[in-house]
Amino acid sequence: GSLIAMGEPVGPPEVARALIWRCREESDRLGLRPVFYQIGETYWQTYLDLGLGLVKLGEEAIVPLHDFGLEGRERADLRQAWNRGKRGGLSFRVAPVEEVPSLLPRLHAISNAWLEDKAGDEKGFSLGSYDPDYLARFPVALVEAEGQIVAFANLWQAPAGAELSVDLMRHVNEAPKGTMDFLFIELFLWGRSQGYARFSLGM
């Protein structure tokens, strides 16, 4: 078996390095293999000092937001997707944390329908899963059509306007084609308007 840590430790470097070693010691005590998933370059040497190897599984996709827009030839596909959503009656808004509890029944229904359509269970770990207590801690981006929520994503917001990302994304089966494209384009535009530097699309 394996003991898997998601991402790197958060805190001062000297404390973080000690925590990485502590994870290795705990893995050894339990007879498990230590795995550090989705790490950056900061502590590579520490992982190598543990006797671990580095395996590249992918790269994090980052969208710079400070100059993001829909103008120009290079953004024609995005502009068309956004216009198609607007013509199809889609609208976007971000529900603040205070509003989220009242939205949870509808979000749960959307999530259940989405899972049923995918014929699977929640994945969890590196992908978000539906948990009402967890969702209620974040603003939620909503796409609506004819006054009904057709897609949503919770927002992760780094301090000081550094980074924006999403963890859980779901949509109704009958959502108009291109709904998720519309959601992400609107998120990029919203993030720029709020002063965020970048949007992480994950690996």
Feature map (PLM): residue ranges:
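A conserved beta-strand-loop-helix scaffold within acyl/acetyltransferase catalytic domains
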Residues: 1-2, 32, 36-54, 66-80, ...
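A short, internal acetyl-CoA/4′-phosphopantetheine-binding micro-motif in the GNAT/acyltransferase core
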Residues: 7-15, 27, 167-178
